[in-house]
Amino acid sequence: MNYKIICYLLFLLLGFAIIFMATVVKAQPLPGTCYTARVVRIIDGDTITVYDNAGCFHRIRLAMIDAPEKEQPFGAEATNALSELLKEGTVSLKVHCIDKYNREVAFVNCDGKDVSAEMLRKGMAMHYHMDFDNCEIYDKFEEAAKRHRQGLWAQDNIETPWDYRHNLAKRRHSNVHKDLFQA
């Protein structure tokens, strides 16, 4: 009888160990880490999910740009433009930092092209200034797109993605207060 109980407990322990090992999350790469991965999802015009050679998924925010949100004018176009740039599927990444949403902010290259620079050049994103050397090239791509009224720069009244998010949060907060007083 004791033998059966011991075997049962060992079996349970083994099961828990397997479950624990399966749920262990790989630590995120440190800034400066470079790796190659396959793009598995385009979330929006500046965020993707990749699958690396070690079998881990990573949520990536493209460094140096901020694309319109999906609900904004040119949001869908920015997402489609990023999808077109990444159609080869394999990218090389260099991690710059981890953002407050736990995404890797990374420089992404596909088919020999800096994806952030290409999004700026096409007018599908705005330059998001970061603490990084050699940012001037990103300013130049954005300025050229503005001059030629490419992509989102064809609009007359442009709301930046960061202003859009800020204003959306204010509207949501305002609506919550309205609902409380109307109840």
State the predicted function of each range:
Residues 2-183:
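Small beta-barrel nucleic-acid-binding modules, primarily SNase/OB-fold domains
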